[in-house]
Each structure stands twice: as structure tokens, then as C-alpha cells.
């Protein structure tokens, strides 16, 4: 449920707080029924929706806006399909209107994606910067999807983006955290939440990203395309929680040599003269 007061260890983005640190998508599910159940099982409170696909009635997206309970979920419209900054800005406005129609009149959020080609689906840094600057001036809360590039991330948070969302590996690839070192650098320096987006395949990878200090994750394909999406949704939700708790708990340092877990003094046979 969308929070009006911050719960302990809430995910805080702009002026909103959430209990769950797992964001989910709505694409690639075999049915709306499975999607609803998987989102519920995950515990996710932020759900991203591809504005262009809903608007154009792409199979699996037509009527999507009415399939989820937006009184309990926060919509994150995304600009998937935008090949330029100009298209992204246009889709962002469509998304804001869609959120208003569905009852979220104060929702000015947008997951910004500018992807000019369809083979590799890698975000365009220049187009992203240009669109982000425009959208921030127009009053949007911008969550940009980017390559794991520290300098780009810094430009975006200095510009006023509410988060940065570096990719773990290409969208839908299931390659996991190929950019872990670069993401760790962004996490170490970012004053805004870092949301790892794209490429995560398994709950163990989700847990690892959270252990690194990510503020949240966005996972779609790994849940939607799993053999059992509902079970995978729950698994990803639990992994996100476990990774967050492990990060807060503080793992022991790696050591070169063994260190006994029980004291070696006072053992039988250790007395003088033995």
C-alpha cells in the first residue's frame, strides 16, 4: 500500500515512501490474471507501465490500466519505445494523463527510457540527459534508465533526477550483474536512491544487488517469463528483503586465512604438561 507516513527503513523517492524495495513491470506475462497474482506475491508497490504500448493497444497491454488496483499500487509510467528525447517527453505527458485518469492526480513520475535501436536496447545517454532536463523543468519526477556510467549518473542527480537506474546487463538478457563494479561506484557516491534495473535473472542476483547497497530493484522479465511467475514474484520479493537486511547487518570482511569460530584455549589436552 502507498504510504503517507514513512515506515521503518522505507524506500524514499521524492516525497513518497514505500515498504517494498522491489519494483515490478507489467510486460511479457501470459495473462493479466498471472500478472496480478505475481505482482501481489512480490509485495511490490511500484509498478511500471509502458505508456506507448497501452496507448496503441499492443497485445498484452490493451486495457492494462484497469487490470491493477491503483488505490494500492503506485504507477510508474515509462517511455519505452521512445527513440529520441522528443518522443520520450511526449510519452511522459501521456503517462501523466493516464495516471490522472486512473485516480493518481498527483502522480508526475516517469521512468525515462530513450533507446534509439532495437537490437541491443541500450539507453542513449545524450538523449536521456536532454529529456531529463526538459521533464524536470516541466515538473516531472524523473527516474532515468541508464548505462552504469558514473559521470552520466552524476550529471543526472545534479540535474535533479529523483533516482538513477543503472542496468545490471541488457534488458531481458538474464545476464545478471555484469556491471557490478560500476554500479557499486554509483551507489557509493549517489545522494539519490540507486535502483538496479534490467538483466537480473535469479533471486540470488537480486539479493546480491541489494547487498551491494542498491536502494531498490526493478525486475520484470525474470518474473514474467519464469515457469511459475507467481512463485518467482514471491522469491524476488523475499530476496530483495534479505539483501537489504544483509546490507544493513554488515557482512564480515574477507580474510586470507582461516579464523576458528570457537576459541582454541581451554581445549582438552591443552593443559601444561599434556
Swiss-Prot record:
Physiological role: Catalyzes the rearrangement of 1-deoxy-D-xylulose 5-phosphate (DXP) to produce the thiazole phosphate moiety of thiamine. Sulfur is provided by the thiocarboxylate moiety of the carrier protein ThiS. In vitro, sulfur can be provided by H(2)S.
Residues forming the catalytic site: 111 (schiff-base intermediate with dxp)
Gene name tied to this protein: thiG
InterPro entries: Aldolase_TIM, Thiazole_synthase_ThiG, ThiG
Family according to the record: Belongs to the ThiG family.
CDD domains in UniProt: ThiG
Protein name stated in the entry: Thiazole synthase
BP GO terms, sorted: thiamine biosynthetic process; thiamine diphosphate biosynthetic process
Amino acid at each position: 500500500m502507498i504510504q503517507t507516513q514513512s515506515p521503518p527503513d522505507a524506500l524514499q523517492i521524492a516525497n513518497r515512501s514505500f515498504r517494498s524495495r522491489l519494483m515490478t513491470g507489467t510486460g511479457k506475462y501470459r495473462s493479466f490474471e498471472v500478472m496480478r497474482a505475481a505482482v501481489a506475491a512480490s509485495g511490490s508497490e511500484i509498478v511500471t507501465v509502458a505508456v506507448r504500448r497501452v496507448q496503441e493497444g499492443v497485445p498484452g497491454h490493451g486495457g492494462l490500466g484497469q487490470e491493477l488496483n491503483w488505490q494500492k499500487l503506485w504507477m510508474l509510467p515509462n517511455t519505452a519505445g521512445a527513440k529520441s528525447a522528443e518522443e520520450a517527453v511526449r510519452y511522459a505527458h501521456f503517462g501523466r494523463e493516464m495516471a490522472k485518469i486512473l485516480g493518481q492526480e498527483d502522480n508526475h513520475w516517469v521512468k525515462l527510457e530513450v533507446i534509439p535501436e532495437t537490437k541491443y536496447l541500450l539507453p542513449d545517454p545524450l538523449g536521456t540527459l536532454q529529456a531529463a532536463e526538459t521533464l524536470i523543468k516541466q515538473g516531472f519526477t524523473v527516474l532515468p534508465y541508464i548505462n552504469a556510467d558514473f559521470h552520466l549518473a552524476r550529471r543526472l542527480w545534479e540535474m535533479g533526477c529523483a533516482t538513477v537506474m543503472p542496468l545490471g546487463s541488457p534488458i531481458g538478457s538474464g545476464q545478471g550483474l555484469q556491471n557490478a563494479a560500476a554500479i557499486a561506484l554509483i551507489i557509493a557516491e549517489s545522494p539519490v536512491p540507486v535502483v538496479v534495473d534490467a538483466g537480473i535473472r535469479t533471486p540470488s542476483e537480486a539479493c546480491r544487488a541489494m547487498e551491494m547497497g542498491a536502494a531498490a530493484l526493478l525486475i520484470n522479465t525474470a518474473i514474467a517469463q519464469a515457469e511459475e511467475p507467481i512463485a518467482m514474484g514471491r522469491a524476488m520479493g523475499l530476496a530483495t528483503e534479505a539483501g537489504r537486511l544483509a546490507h544493513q547487518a554488515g557482512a564480515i570482511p574477507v580474510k586470507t586465512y582461516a579464523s576458528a569460530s570457537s576459541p582454541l584455549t581451554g581445549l582438552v589436552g591443552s593443559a601444561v604438561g599434556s
